[in-house]
Amino acid sequence: MERLMSDGYPFIFQLIDKSESDDYLIQTLQYRFKSDKSHHAYIVRVECYKKHAYCVKFFDKANINSKNKFSLRSNTFEARTILYTMFHIMLDVLKRDEKASFFFIGAEDEKDQDGMVSRRFRLYRRFVLSTVSDDKFEHFRRNDLSLYILVNKEYVEDTASYADELAGIVQRLMH
């Protein structure tokens, strides 16, 4: 499952932000990295939910104050390297919590059509299918939510029910 770090940018773990006001969210792990190519800095937020479910999100630090920061495109044409960096951050989370399962949502941008799978989701899906084997994680997709779920098969007995429950939580949080 592991790849060389040369496939992504070096990253730094910054902080743990505890949540006490949310029914589902426990804490958020924050990482950062900087692109050697574009010199853009990125913030990665890994939200830890109940039952060891982690949502991986990232944005260009230049957009930190935008309410649409997760939807804005940086147009640096380095998606592959950024996604490998996300993959390595997921491995770091897995070292911290061996029971971790992951999910991410392909945020819509201005070129996406309502009701259709987002372009980001399609990119994430292709990347994950080619990078994460199904030995350790079972892959689930919810096209209607542009949601991709990786369920840790070693620690979750009923992976389909877990994925359905997680999709339900995501759906409630989105609306």
Listing of model-derived features with the role each one plays in the protein:
Residues 1-175:
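Non-catalytic substrate-recognition and accessory regions of acyl/acetyltransferase enzymes
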